[in-house]
């Protein structure tokens, strides 16, 4: 045995000092590895739509209701199943309603507790007692453990079991216990959650989604293009902050900044009212997708703010393009293509009339130079993002749980794309003097995204990393954007639709090719035959015949459009994916009404399951990434056991 092995085994022996303890731990590990694989739940592109997100999270994409049918399908009718499901999703709110509607509340408590315990026993059966115990609320842990691991059908245990429940009811703790059981069931039906990007965008409550995720028991996060914009703003990027405000103004969603995060936009409002007071800002009128009741004065002010921050954004983008020639974005230096006297712009060899040619803050000789007032304003805005504690807490969580991509249990997860040439080869990009492509490119993007947040303000490293974060939002070789260019300016200022075109990276055509998908999987160290790519970012237009299952099942696109704006386009309210011990299931969801409707009328999101891949042999924990680590631990312990038995190490009894 090598010296290094003995050194390691001596350390291991401190934790397992006897043959008995070592053998027991090996048996425990083998037992865990033989349990069924836990359920993975994949969500993508939530876009701030908290109500629908919360419902899908609470119902486990329909898993809770399926488990209820498994246990009580022959005993309960559909109405009773819906009622029990709603209770589990929203226990406190549902019990408030039932308390006023139920004649014999004591009997209802008793029946409900029996059912919830039986259901909880069922969903806990694939986990170790230790794992279930850790998931239990502290106040009820002992009682729950007693109830979950007793067989109350046996006569000698039945009285003991019923007495516990009767005491819970008589002591006035039934509602708290029902809530505890419901939340435990929610937690046990999904072992691990993957968010494949874009909590943020135009939806009203990304902050509530972040709060929920921060309290979730087990998850990871693959950053999306909208997430990266907020991360850049929180890192101190002026251009990212300007983009965040512009998008929020465009979709009448400034409340997320002012009310949810406490970022004051008063300096922007005062600036806009002064500089654009005589400007109708016709082409900067916000989109009122939610039909919220705003006064004309409010809309007028928001339109001015919208235009003011947009011009600042275009100037800041020009600064970056000019100082980062390696980004190869000179064609996006649009402010210098404007004829300010004629009110026209030259784009790709053609001249176009500008819809709006009122630019009071632009110096035609130095179009990217901020005025003193603009510089002061964007400084205040950037400081507000950096000093917002709640936003910083959310962004720190994104950094701690997130990444550009993830390999997990043989699958590859990423939000946007892997930049490809037409021939399927990986596109290269030079970063800090070195060329990167494929996996190494995404790894470098991740390193620089982290540097943008942690590097000291004012350093050249910080400035470069922040510029890269902006490039990830808008650049042609960005794995998060996936298009040739972002034509934001043209959409505001040029009527001709031909100028609005954003050509997709060849990846989006090639991802239908099974060989390309296998090539990508192998680039990331995965088995091209067995693995899958889980992708978000682009809404799947099911209404036009598009399928989320591509490349013979190798590519699964799970952005079905949580954002309400996409519902007409997609005919859906989103896709989620489930990966359990039996295989992969894609779940498509119809639009959600409201939480209040779900609680009162027991409506659920109508979901349709599609089995993508069924396992011939049920997957066990040993077949997962965690299983590989446990197997390695077991092998190390077997070496320790041999060392004890061969006399190389002595037991410490």
From Swiss-Prot:
Q: From the UniProt record, list the coiled-coil ranges.
A: none
Instruction: Supply the InterPro entries for this chain.
Output: FBPtase_class3 (IPR009164), Metallo-depent_PP-like (IPR029052)
Q: Provide this UniProt record's keywords sorted from A to Z.
A: Carbohydrate metabolism, Hydrolase, Manganese
GO BP annotation list: gluconeogenesis
This protein's cofactor list reads: Mn(2+)
**Which Pfam family would be a valid example here?**
FBPase_2
According to its UniProt record, the EC number is 3.1.3.11
Which Gene3D superfamilies does the UniProt record give?
3.60.21.10
Q: Which reaction does it catalyse?
A: beta-D-fructose 1,6-bisphosphate + H2O = beta-D-fructose 6-phosphate + phosphate
Q: In which pathway does it act?
A: Carbohydrate biosynthesis; gluconeogenesis
Q: Which family does it belong to?
A: Belongs to the FBPase class 3 family.
User: What protein is this chain from?
Assistant: Fructose-1,6-bisphosphatase class 3
């Amino acid at each position: 045995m090598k010296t290094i092995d003995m050194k390691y085994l001596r350390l291991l022996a401190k934790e397992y000092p006897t043959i008995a303890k070592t053998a027991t731990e090996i048996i425990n590990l083998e037992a865990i590895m033989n349990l069924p694989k836990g359920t993975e739940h994949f969500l993508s592109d939530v876009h701030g739509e908290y109500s629908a997100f919360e419902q899908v999270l609470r119902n486990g994409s329909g898993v809770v209701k399926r488990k209820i049918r498994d246990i009580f399908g022959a005993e309960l009718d559909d109405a009773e199943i819906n009622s029990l499901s709603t209770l589990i999703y929203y226990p406190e709110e549902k019990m408030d309603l039932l308390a006023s509607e139920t004649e014999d509340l004591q009997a209802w408590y008793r029946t409900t507790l029996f059912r919830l315990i039986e259901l909880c026993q069922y969903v806990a059966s694939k986990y170790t007692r230790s794992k279930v115990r850790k998931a239990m609320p502290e106040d009820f842990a002992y009682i729950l453990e007693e109830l979950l691991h007793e067989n109350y059908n046996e006569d000698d245990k039945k009285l003991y079991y019923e007495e516990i429940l009767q005491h819970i009811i008589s002591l006035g703790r039934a509602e708290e216990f029902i809530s505890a059981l419901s939340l435990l069931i929610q937690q046990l039906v999904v072992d691990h959650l993957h968010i494949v990007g874009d909590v943020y965008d135009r939806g009203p409550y990304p902050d509530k989604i972040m709060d929920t995720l921060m309290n979730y028991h087990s998850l990871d996060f693959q950053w999306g293009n909208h997430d990266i914009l907020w991360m850049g703003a929180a890192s101190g990027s002026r251009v990212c902050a300007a983009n965040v405000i512009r998008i929020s103004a465009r979709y009448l969603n400034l409340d997320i900044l002012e009310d949810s995060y406490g970022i004051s936009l008063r300096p922007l409002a005062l600036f806009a009212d002064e500089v654009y007071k005589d400007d109708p800002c016709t082409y900067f009128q916000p989109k009122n997708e939610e039909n919220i009741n705003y006064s004309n004065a409010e809309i007028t002010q928001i339109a001015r703010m919208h235009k003011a921050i947009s011009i600042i954004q275009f100037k800041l983008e020009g600064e970056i393009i000019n100082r980062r020639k390696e980004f190869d974005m000179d064609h996006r230096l649009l402010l210098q293509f404007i004829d300010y006297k004629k009110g026209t712009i030259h784009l790709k060899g053609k001249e176009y009339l500008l819809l709006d040619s009122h630019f009071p803050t632009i110096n035609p000789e130095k179009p990217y130079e901020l005025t003193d007032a603009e510089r002061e304003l964007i400084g205040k805005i950037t400081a507000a993002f950096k000093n917002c504690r709640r936003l910083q807490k959310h962004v720190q969580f994104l950094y701690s749980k997130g990444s550009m991509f993830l390999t997990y249990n043989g699958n590859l997860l990423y939000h946007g794309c892997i930049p490809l040439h037409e021939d399927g080869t990986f596109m290269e990009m030079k970063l800090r003097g070195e060329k990167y492509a494929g996996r190494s490119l995404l790894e470098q993007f991740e390193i620089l995204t982290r540097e943008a947040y942690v590097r000291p303000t004012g350093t050249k490293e910080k400035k470069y990393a922040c510029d890269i974060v902006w490039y990830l939002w808008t650049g042609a070789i960005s794995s998060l954007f996936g298009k040739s260019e972002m034509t934001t300016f043209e959409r505001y200022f040029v009527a001709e639709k031909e100028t609005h075109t954003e050509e997709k990276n060849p990846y989006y055509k090639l991802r239908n090719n099974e060989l390309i998908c296998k090539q990508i999987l192998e680039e990331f160290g995965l088995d091209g035959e067995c693995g899958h790519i889980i992708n978000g970012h682009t809404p799947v237009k099911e209404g036009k015949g598009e399928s989320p299952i591509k490349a013979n099942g190798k590519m699964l696109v799970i952005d079905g459009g949580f954002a309400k704006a996409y519902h007409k386009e997609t005919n859906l309210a989103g896709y989620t994916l489930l990966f359990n011990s039996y295989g992969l299931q894609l779940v498509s969801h119809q639009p959600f009404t409201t939480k209040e409707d779900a609680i009162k009328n027991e409506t659920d999101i109508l979901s349709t399951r599609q089995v993508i891949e069924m396992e011939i042999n049920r997957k066990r924990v040993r077949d997962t990434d965690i299983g590989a680590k446990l197997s390695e631990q077991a092998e190390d312990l077997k070496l320790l056991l041999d060392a004890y038995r061969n006399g190389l190490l002595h037991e410490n009894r």
